[in-house]
């Protein structure tokens, strides 16, 4: 209620995530969804963990405003799941996906590749096992090691080994090949959808559509201004839930960087016309990558990263930002 005044237009998408919303009491979920006007939104997504998908939860889903479910499968190999501290088994993930498919035709499943001990054969088994469930949408991410996390500490202690880049590239190639064969559109670096089932909510981030984030650690982008809430609950409560603890007014350079980083994540790509004063520098950088095939032009003349280069796109993005 304290931030309702920031919503100048009707809410088009709602996304309950950033944690484990599926572990909340359905009555609380109903209150949250009602407060944000979810019943009027075109897309309402909730993130779930396989272990939270019970008969009662599925029953609640069927009568709620939620019309899209995103579930973290991560792997269909028991040892790999245990290695990254996941609570569910492969069997539980498969059963949960089948339960959810009974109440929604818009099911998104998440996978991770580059897991400790994972080889190409194991990755293919997980990938094909998930595709056999025919989800409307698939997200697949390369495992990252973030400072301060359990995985980071284990790697630093020599208890696990990070997958070599050459293996990650092979895994990504297998992913692109399998999803294309199954009829999915590869519309963003890590996202694949059946026709008509792209994530509207996530696409709004990549299109720089304004969004409001609620809860500890949530980010917002409103009126060209970025803000993010304190990540700790006491700090969030002290800020009154307003998200005004930290505010960043973007410079022209930062707006250009945002445009590059978001647009070049997608198959739609970047229009040079949107680059403003940085257009000449952007075109110069693009020519080098167009020449070696790392980038290509769409039929509409938009610039995008070639699918085979998406996994190493960070290097390309840095070149554009530094141009």
Label each residue range with its predicted role.
Residues 301-306:
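Minor-groove-contacting beta-hairpin "wing" of winged helix-turn-helix DNA-binding domains
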Residues 1-5, 9-278:
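C-terminal scaffold of the Radical SAM
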Residues 276-291:
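Short amphipathic alpha-helical interaction segments
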Residues 169, 280, 307-310:
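An alpha-helix initiation/capping motif
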């Amino acid at each position: 209620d304290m931030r309702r005044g920031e919503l100048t237009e009707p809410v088009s998408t709602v996304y309950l995530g950033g944690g484990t919303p599926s572990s909340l009491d359905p009555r609380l979920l109903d209150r949250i969804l009602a407060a944000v006007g979810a019943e009027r939104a075109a897309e309402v997504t909730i993130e779930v963990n396989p272990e939270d998908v019970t008969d009662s939860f599925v029953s609640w889903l069927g009568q709620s405003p939620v019309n899209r479910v995103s579930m973290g499968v991560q792997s269909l190999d028991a040892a790999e799941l245990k290695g990254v501290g996941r609570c569910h088994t492969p069997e539980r993930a498969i059963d949960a996906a089948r339960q959810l498919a009974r109440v929604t035709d818009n099911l998104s499943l998440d996978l991770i590749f580059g897991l400790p001990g994972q080889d190409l054969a194991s990755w293919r088994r997980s990938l094909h096992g998930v595709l056999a469930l025919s989800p409307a949408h698939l997200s697949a991410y390369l495992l990252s090691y973030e400072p301060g996390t359990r995985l980071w500490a284990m790697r630093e202690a020599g208890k696990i080994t990070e997958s070599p880049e050459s293996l990650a590239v092979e895994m990504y190639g297998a992913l692109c090949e399998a999803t294309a064969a199954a009829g999915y559109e590869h519309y963003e670096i890590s996202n694949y959808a059946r026709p008509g089932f792209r994530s509207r909510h996530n696409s709004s981030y990549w299109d720089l559509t304004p969004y409001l984030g609620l809860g500890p650690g949530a980010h917002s982008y409103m009126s060209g201004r970025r803000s993010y809430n304190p990540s700790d609950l006491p700090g969030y409560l002290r800020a009154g839930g307003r998200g005004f603890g930290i505010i960043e007014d973007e410079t022209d350079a930062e707006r250009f960087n945002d445009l590059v980083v978001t647009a070049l994540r997608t198959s739609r790509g970047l229009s040079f016309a949107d680059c403003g004063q940085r257009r000449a520098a952007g075109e110069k950088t693009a020519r080098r990558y167009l020449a070696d095939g790392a980038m290509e032009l769409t039929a509409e003349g938009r610039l995008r990263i070639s699918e085979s280069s998406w996994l190493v796109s960070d290097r390309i993005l840095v070149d554009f930002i530094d141009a």
